[in-house]
Amino acid sequence: MPEKPEVMTVVKNLIPGIVGKRITDCAIYWDNIIASPTPKEFKKKIIGQKINSITTRGKFIVIELDDYSLLIHLRMEGKFFFRNKGDEITKHEHVEFILDNEISFRYHDVRKFGKMYLIPKEDTYKVKPLSELGKEFYDDITEDYLFDKIHKLKLPI
């Protein structure tokens, strides 16, 4: 499973290829990759959305679109490839996004464990799975925050 530094590296490498581009088409070749909404709704909602930014939260990749956030968890070994529009789909490419520059941005996952969630932008950090995550390593962690977290635990010492 990619750890946080690997996920951050993936994001860093994706930024020049996708930020500022618009999704003009989407094809889903393995429905189980799409966790929410249904694959049909996912495709309908994501087409026409512009990719405004990309970041991480935990091990999730968060792609901010016009109206939605696309959350992607790579799980065991998911990865992305850029291809020319119309290039043959390879065996383990399960989701394809066509961008407005005629580039095909593809999710590749041999084990098919990865997941994608399309969430209304205003709910990105309010609903599962992101709402269940703790602070990032670079967030300010205060003494009061730690005190509060420790005292809310109901675990035996």
State what each model feature region is.
Residues M1-R57, V62-D66, E88, D148:
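Extended, highly charged segments
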Residues L70-I157:
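Phosphate/anion-contacting hairpin/loop surfaces
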